[in-house]
């Protein structure tokens, strides 16, 4: 990384006479690239300007962060979909996404046939939409087990949202509370509870019919079988599990699910998941809690029915404690070296160097075996 940073600085110096402003935010500056990029855009561009901001990339994080950026009307994302790197520029195929138009279509779709949304701002609708997408899974939390993108999960969650909004006639996310770090009232937990309830009504049908249908399709595991056949040596530290130990299409799948993923206390898992939703919401909102230490300690997330049951019994107690939750308090950033140790291969030279030190605390951050269970769903 040091060599890369030096090379980037050299490139920046070489471009001094090209009338370009080059901003480098390297690994020594805390934060993910997309978030740092959005902060730079917000701090360096006039929101009243008509100048277009072009960003290379089309991943979900980048799209969602662009939707809630104060300059969203000016942002255009693009990506080169040409896999042949030898093609000249004129023959390349690019995909463009106009964030302003996307925002308009999302709001139009949410408002269609629902007069109860007329008092809710477009920005608030976008925040609601993004929060609902958290339930589909992201870099920090897995998806709700009965929600899969390839099985129309987004449409399912939006139907639940429209049903609930008819009842409450107010947004799911309170932007004033969110911007003031008032966690207790930034999410309408009664609405979220009802969304979980509506999701839970079709849970058993989903696993018995929809989920088990494609799980029986052996072709979706072809690449995994090929990888496992390669990793047969005694020293191999990666293995992909394909057998469906949980048997979702049989009675008792919930108990087997929690047992398989070593979830002993379901209430604790539900609480951790909900705290995770608050953390991610704050993270997307300019990282307003400035917390760098939170992580979800379980491999998978609870069922919608269990999240509903948890909120029915524990909502008030949860809200009493959320403003004082350690995971939503400011903390120190993890160093670049610590981050590297979280992902380094066991036999790396850097790891060997620290092993010689004997008492290095960083050694505890190394992984030794990696097992991937593909039974939770196909690549989405």
Residue ranges and their predicted role:
Residues 1-380:
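Noncatalytic, typically N-terminal accessory segments of nucleic acid-processing enzymes
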